[in-house]
Amino acid sequence: MSSHDISWHSPASVYFSSDLDVKRIAGKLRGCWTDLLLRQESCCERVLQKSSSSMDYFLFRLFCSLALASLLVQRADSNEILGLKIPFDPILNANTVCLTLPGLTKKQLDVCMRNPDVTASAIQGIQIAIHECQHQFRGHRWNCSSLETRNKIPYESVVFSRGFRESAFAYAIAAAGVVHAVSNACAMGKLKACGCDEKRRGDEEALRIKLNRLQLEAINRGKGMVHGVMEHFPAEALGPQDSWEWGGCSPNVEYGERFSKDFLDSRETYRDIHSRMRLHNNRVGRQVVVDHMRRKCKCHGTSGSCQLKTCWQVTPEFRTVGSLLKERLNVATLIKAHNRNTGQVENAHHTHRRRANINDLVYFEKSPDFCERDLGSDSAGTQGRICNKTSQGMDNCESLCCGRGHNILQQTRSERCNCKFHWCCYVVCEECRITEWVSVCK
């Protein structure tokens, strides 16, 4: 029997009443065979949308689902059909990552060639950082929009070549994004060079033996049947009398921090004030992730008890990282070059002002107002930006429009609406067009 027969007729014939049903449906889906091999349902979806009746819709969807399930079961054999070699995961090597990634310095290219998979995770971390930057600065005159680079290194953006407060934030959050992404990728087993944090892993076999012993003791004391109860709770809930042991898989934040330093700090080849500012802010960003790692625990034991606690570390939510760095930006310190070439920086304020702390963001160039378009200072201007005339924040029309005033315009946009869940298991939505009045900066 051919693979074609196995994939299409065997699963379907169990559910359809006659060969006529199978032939009719297979005829409509004939052009979808390659799509199904690639585990793509787009072709099936196109046929479903053209279904003439609810019964056809149900039969077509069931047929597609069965065919996909059959292909997954026979994955090893089905990959050979049509001569297709389909990898389970994308292949990450030096050619597919490093040589296709513009903007890398020579040192960064060397780091990438040694660890292309880690570099790919680092780039994902930078993208996450850019999106978080856009969230933190939404409604501000400068809103991180120039940093969006579609999975490329964003350091060619003008803001990275300046010494603004915004530059300090951009460097710090990018470094934090690399630590965050690489550390978690290690724990998820995605990278060859690292795994779980071995310092916080614990002896799994010893924990299993200990739990078995505790359960047997509970049985002997007549405390009921043996059945593990697992509940997650914050480490802060643990009282001083509670004991716990390392278990599970903690993100390898030590490796993530080290790779972030190797990959990003290697861009700096000089010891001028600009390089020192960038190195300092890179370190601040990394440290925010490290300092806000938190413990998460799981309770093991017989029903209603917690005879053994195992804990592991988790990285902070990246929204938390962004908010913490934004708070530090609000008290960032203006610096000037030190007379001695020691690589240190000092604040440019008078002696009675607060000196720069090691955990402060620092900058050396006062920011422009970002009101008018000026590519030399990474300012896109605010003309055409939507403002909120009732807001008390940075997005209020008076502030965002720089006193130029605003127009009231009618805007029409589309969004999904009236979504309904169908058993089983898909959601169908309508597309609604919404017309609203918005305030737009002149």
UniProtKB/Swiss-Prot annotation:
Outcome of gene disruption: Morpholino knockdown of the protein causes arrest of tooth development. Otherwise, mutant embryos appear grossly normal, excepting some cartilage abnormalities.
Localisation per UniProt entry: Secreted, Extracellular space, Extracellular matrix; Secreted
Entries under InterPro entries matching the protein: Wnt, Wnt10, Wnt_C, Wnt_CS
A Pfam family assignment: wnt
SMART domains in UniProt: WNT1
Disulfide bond entries: C133-C144, C186-C194, C196-C249, C297-C311, C299-C306, C371-C402, C387-C397, C401-C441, C417-C432, C419-C429, C424-C425
Glycosylation sites per record: N143, N388
Listed GO biological process terms: canonical Wnt signaling pathway; cell fate commitment; neuron differentiation; odontogenesis
Keywords: Developmental protein, Disulfide bond, Extracellular matrix, Glycoprotein, Lipoprotein, Secreted, Signal, Wnt signaling pathway
One GO CC annotation: extracellular space
Modification note: Palmitoleoylation is required for efficient binding to frizzled receptors. Depalmitoleoylation leads to Wnt signaling pathway inhibition.
Keyword Signal on entry: yes
Lipidation (O-palmitoleoyl serine): S303
Gene Ontology MF terms in the entry: cytokine activity; frizzled binding
Family the UniProt entry places it in: Belongs to the Wnt family.
Job of this protein: Ligand for members of the frizzled family of seven transmembrane receptors. Required for normal tooth development. Regulates the expression of genes involved in tooth development.
Other comments on record: Wnt10a overexpression in embryos results in loss of anterior neural identity, causing a phenotype with small or no eyes.
Protein name, entry field: Protein Wnt-10a
Organism: Danio rerio
Lineage start: Eukaryota, Metazoa, Chordata, Craniata, Vertebrata
